[in-house]
Structures are given as structure tokens and as C-alpha cells.
């Protein structure tokens, strides 16, 4: 593949996530009905984001914890020039201690354990077992896009970085699927088909399979993204991202459909956005969405620095 195409998709992955996250905040935690009420004509721009008690905590055009935590991983890759799990965990904890706005309850509980930074995976396992192994939130899949941009060992790195906070095999499988999809798009110009994704999912947890089926064979509505009791489930987010990957004809179309579905929309759109950015490249992300990001120039500098590691 030409280097220019790789670079476009590489940058598209990171910007695709940040844009999806920032736009998805507009409908986060809303039911689809509420989305219709607040945005009767849809949403096209950050300036339209309603300023209720939840959303006014962020300035329009800012991303949330999804991209913050992804950038903790990216910063670690660049600073260490390698994958260092303890360094990533330290950066997560530092981010949490310095505000950590939007942090999920599960992620907070894991990182609040006293010895988190010395043995993060053990902390994640303890909290998972304390919850009777039921918790499978989307707080790891939301940040895994950047792992797909590593040149090698994507599977093991996605597994281990996931387990810094999320130990459940559904979370681990979600992360490996997303990172593998991005890696294949960026570096191999290859689409993972249904059989490929099922093959990966089976290695982790059979419960992933039904969501792969919904994403491949059914409409986006079949995923019930705004389900009040389980909107933060890792498999709903994975399903939304896979639906966009296989069915969206453009970055914009895929993101808007997911955003207008409500639920945990910033996370769903962040993960789908990373995949669509990897598929279509940074130039296919609407210019006003990229330039409208509050920290667009900082993000651009970070991605360029990460990309330069491969030169």
C-alpha cells in the first residue's frame, strides 16, 4: 500500500474517534424518542449540542473520557517508544486524579484500588469478581482504536490493555475485534468479513456472536442502543461499530445514524468513528467536524508524532 493511503487512514482513525466522541455527546444518555424531541431536524454541527446539566460540563467541540483515555495510551506509546502496560495504567490513574471527567463507574472502581498502578490487571480482576463476573461495560472498547495502529502484536496488546481495567472476556473480545479491524484497514487495505469477525469472537465469549449477527444481518435499530438498563454494554457498542463498518457508505452517514440512535452515543460513535475513519480516511471526515474540535491542533500534533514512529 502507498504510504499516503496508510497515513490518511492512520490519521482518520484518531480523528474519526475524536469527532464521533465530540458529536456523540449531543445525544449521550438520551432515548431515541428524546433525541427526536431535542433534535427534530437532526444534528449537523457541534454548535447545535443542547446545553443541559450533563452536556454543559464540556464545551462544544470537546471530546469526552473515551478519547481522553485513548490519548493516554497514544501518549504512552510515543513517550516509551514501546508498549508499557504499567506506564499506560499510571497515565490512566493520573488522568482520573486530575478530573477524569466522564469516567465510568467500573473504571473508577478499578483504578481507585490502592495498588492499581503496580498491578492493574489484578485490580481489574478483583472488581470483576466482586461483581460476580457480570460487568462488561464499554470503557475498554472505547479506547482500543489506537492499539490497532501498532505495527505488531495487536491481539495480545489489545487483550492486555483492555484488562488494565476490564477483565470480562466480552470486553477483551470486543477490543480485539475493533483493534484487528482497524489494523487490517490501515496497514493491509483489507476488510474483515463476517466469518473473520466470528472467528475472532469465538475465541473469547460465545455471547459476542449474537451481536455480530445483529450488526451484519439486521438494522441498527435491532441493537437497541438506547436500552435504558444496558446502554453501556460493550457488545452494544461493538455491534454499533460493526454495523457502521459493514453498512455505512460514508463516515458522515454512519456517524449520524449512530448519534441519532441515542444511548451511550459518544462511546458508540467514538468506536464506530475510529473504524470509519480507518476505512474512508481522514479526508472523508467533514472538514467542519475536524476543525470544530476544541483541541484539533493538539490532536493533529499527537497523531503526527505517533505516526512518525513508523518512519
What positions do the PLM features span?
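Structured, active/binding-site neighborhoods that engage oxygen-rich ligands
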Residues: 1-311
Amino acid at each position: 500500500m502507498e504510504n499516503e493511503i496508510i497515513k490518511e487512514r492512520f490519521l482518520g482513525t484518531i480523528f474519526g474517534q475524536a469527532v464521533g466522541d465530540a458529536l456523540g455527546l449531543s445525544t449521550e444518555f438520551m432515548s431515541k424518542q428524546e433525541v427526536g424531541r431535542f433534535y427534530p431536524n437532526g444534528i449537523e454541527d457541534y454548535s447545535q449540542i443542547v446545553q443541559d446539566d450533563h452536556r454543559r460540563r464540556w464545551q462544544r467541540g470537546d471530546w469526552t473520557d473515551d478519547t481522553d483515555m485513548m490519548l493516554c495510551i497514544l501518549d504512552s506509546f510515543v513517550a516509551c517508544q514501546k508498549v508499557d502496560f504499567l506506564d499506560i495504567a499510571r497515565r490512566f490513574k493520573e488522568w482520573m486524579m486530575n478530573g477524569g471527567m466522564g469516567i465510568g463507574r467500573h473504571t473508577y472502581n478499578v483504578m481507585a484500588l490502592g495498588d492499581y498502578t503496580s498491578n492493574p490487571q489484578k485490580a481489574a480482576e478483583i472488581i470483576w469478581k466482586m461483581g460476580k463476573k457480570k460487568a462488561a461495560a464499554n470503557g475498554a472498547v472505547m479506547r482500543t482504536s489506537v492499539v490497532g495502529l501498532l505495527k505488531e502484536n495487536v491481539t495480545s496488546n489489545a487483550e492486555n490493555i483492555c484488562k488494565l481495567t476490564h477483565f470480562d472476556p466480552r470486553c477483551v473480545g470486543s477490543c480485539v475485534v475493533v483493534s484487528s479491524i482497524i489494523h487490517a484497514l490501515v496497514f493491509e487495505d483489507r476488510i474483515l468479513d463476517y466469518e473473520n469477525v466470528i472467528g475472532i469472537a469465538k475465541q473469547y465469549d460465545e455471547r459476542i456472536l449474537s451481536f455480530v449477527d445483529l450488526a451484519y444481518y439486521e438494522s441498527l435499530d435491532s441493537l437497541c442502543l438506547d436500552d435504558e438498563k444496558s446502554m453501556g454494554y460493550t457488545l452494544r457498542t461493538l455491534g454499533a461499530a460493526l454495523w457502521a463498518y459493514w453498512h455505512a457508505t460514508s463516515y458522515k452517514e454512519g456517524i449520524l445514524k449512530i448519534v441519532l440512535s441515542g444511548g451511550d452515543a459518544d462511546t458508540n460513535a467514538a468506536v464506530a468513528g475510529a473504524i470509519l475513519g480507518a476505512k474512508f480516511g481522514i479526508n472523508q471526515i467533514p472538514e467542519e467536524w475536524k476543525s470544530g474540535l476544541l483541541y484539533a491542533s493538539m490532536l493533529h500534533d499527537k497523531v503526527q508524532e505517533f505516526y512518525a514512529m513508523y518512519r
